[in-house]
């Protein structure tokens, strides 16, 4: 039998599992293990009447699912929204976490949590990760601007029952890469056949997963067209058409932009017709003096 002649160790890489294959910038600024913690912000920090949320961030490592499940089972309030900021990682772990989020009927959003108690300029050094790992709530700030959930994180995100991608955050996808180690000297055709079977299996697993999550098969078709080395940022019409975020008027919260001249900002996207296009709207408020704004 084939299995007696050859010994293959195969690893299906979905975005981010193999560090040797990543561009260095892809995971810059992210912890090497998926981190989860309770965060508490200012009143209405995560929406009207919401000041507490669950932060999940960093690379999706191969032990992430058990860790995330254990943490969430201990959270007394199942209605707390989950904010994701991750460059991806292990796809099997993403599937497992997604299925647990679905069973929990979770609300997931793409957002970046910042802990002021951490050293300025970093959120992933050992001291900061220790703060986040401590029991209880962590005082934090929340932002959707430039937050990202890409690669395998997108699968994790799809598990939530309620999914919200703010107009200034990113959900992105790309195809898988198959890597395997060959022991011995098998015929090239045997290697090619093995590769083909594994990729077919990966596509099938993805299709089954997306169908279970209620997502259009069009997303899987799109993923197959995007090379592993690239990322496709899902557009608002795609988010709507694929059934990922079907809100007719997605928007951001009002946020203070700490520029040379600070201002508060809000962005919204309004669905046109059947959702094939969205109208972008942005508001900016500046203070001209202590008594007047514009």
Segments (PLM) and residue ranges:
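Bacterial N-terminal signal peptides
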Residues: 6-14
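N-terminal organellar transit peptides
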Residues: 18-148, 152, 162-172, 177-294
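Positively charged n-region of N-terminal signal peptides that target proteins for export
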Residues: 1-5
């Amino acid at each position: 039998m084939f299995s007696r002649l050859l010994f293959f160790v195969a690893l299906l890489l979905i975005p981010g599992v193999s560090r040797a294959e990543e561009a260095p910038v892809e995971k810059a600024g992210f912890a090497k293990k998926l981190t989860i913690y309770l965060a508490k912000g200012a009143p209405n920090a995560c929406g009207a009447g919401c000041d507490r949320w669950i932060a999940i961030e960093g690379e999706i490592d191969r032990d992430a699912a058990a860790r995330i499940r254990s943490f969430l089972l201990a959270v007394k309030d199942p209605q707390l929204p989950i904010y994701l900021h991750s460059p991806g990682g292990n796809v099997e772990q993403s599937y497992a976490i997604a299925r647990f989020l679905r069973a929990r009927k979770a609300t997931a959003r793409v957002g970046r949590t910042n802990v002021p108690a951490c050293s300025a300029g970093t959120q992933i050094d050992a001291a900061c990760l220790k703060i986040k790992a401590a029991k209880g709530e962590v005082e934090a700030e929340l932002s959707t601007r430039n937050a990202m959930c890409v690669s395998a994180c997108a699968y994790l995100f799809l598990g939530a029952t309620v999914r919200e991608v703010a107009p200034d955050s990113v959900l992105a996808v790309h195809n898988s890469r198959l890597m395997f180690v060959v022991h011995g000297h098998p015929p090239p055709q045997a290697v090619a056949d093995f590769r083909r079977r594994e990729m077919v299996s990966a596509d099938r697993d993805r299709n089954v997963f997306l169908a279970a999550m209620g997502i259009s098969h069009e997303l899987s078709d799109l993923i197959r067209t995007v090379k592993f080395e690239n990322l496709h940022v899902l557009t608002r019409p795609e988010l709507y058409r694929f059934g990922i975020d079907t809100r007719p008027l997605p928007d951001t919260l009002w946020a203070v932009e700490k520029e040379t001249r600070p201002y508060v900002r809000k962005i919204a996207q309004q669905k046109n017709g059947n959702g094939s296009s969205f109208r972008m709207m942005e508001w900016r408020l500046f203070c001209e003096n202590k008594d007047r704004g514009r």
